[in-house]
Amino acid sequence: MYRKILAVTAMSMLLCGCTSGKNVVGHSTGRDDIGGQTPAEAALLTDSTEKVCYGQGYETDSENRPVGAMQAQEKYGAYGGEYIGDKNDKTIYLTFDEGYENGCTGRILDILKEKNVTATFYVTLDYVKSSPDLVSRMINEGHEVGNHTCTHPSLPDISDDMVFEEIHGLESYISDNFGGYKTVTMRPPRGEFSVRTLRLVKNMGYDTVLWSFAYNDWNVDDQPDIKKAYERITSATHNGAIYLLHAVSETNTAILADVIDYWQDNGYSVKSITE
């Protein structure tokens, strides 16, 4: 089922359109106090239920940062949405989506360990139940396990109570079965959200993490060419990048070590979202 969902919703990922402090990828919260509003919050006066099918698009600025990601950060960052990190931060935030296991995750973990970098793995309940040893490795080796919901629904299409159950159900299962581990960031299935779901997720203590880079890597039967994929990924490098890669991809697995080398050789740190 997860494979079908990925195939049906793939292109939307690319094209659709407290006190003062910083959030998980280094943005200023813009608040002077708990009750304060940022300009973005003031502009969005109601919890809109309009579904946003997010994608970073192809347009970039003079610093190679995707315009779509920057616009989304400006518009939705006040609600806990994370699309791109700070422009002055020479960091790559490396994330993987895990809906089912395709034999690649163990090798990905080996590479990350060899390169001494961490990543965030967004998992579903089915994945956690079917691959507990891999989830344990993620946690034990210092990576972040993120919440990708129990059943991978489009969050704007379900009720407030169901959104809560989708996120809290996975959170509770992971906590109960992995030594009290607490998930603190969430990636919305299919990259779909609304102001309503952003607020709900934020009220649960989560940031909603999207991305500033994603590409067509999820179809295991039609994998991208290795050389082209390497060029696509490295040429998109930018400060504060949030990379979404699918861990089912043999291509991603084959080039990951070289991609990390490229980033590090060019002065970038590679981290999980919360590191």
Please place each PLM-identified region on the residue numbering:
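A broad, structure-centric signal for solvent-exposed, well-ordered loop/edge residues
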Residues: 8, 130, 135, 145, ...
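Terminal accessory/targeting
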Residues: 1-92, 110-119, 239-275
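Divalent metal-coordination and catalytic microenvironments
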Residues: 97, 112, 145, 186-189, ...
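Alpha-helical scaffold elements lining the catalytic groove of polysaccharide deacetylases
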Residues: 104, 153-178, 192-239, 252-258
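A short, flexible N-terminal coil/short beta segment enriched in small residues
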Residues: 42-45, 183, 190
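Active-site beta->alpha N-cap acidic-glycine motif
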Residues: 54-156, 162-175, 182-183, 269
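A cross-domain feature marking catalytic cores of carbohydrate-active enzymes
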Residues: 96, 123-126, 147-149, 188-190, ...
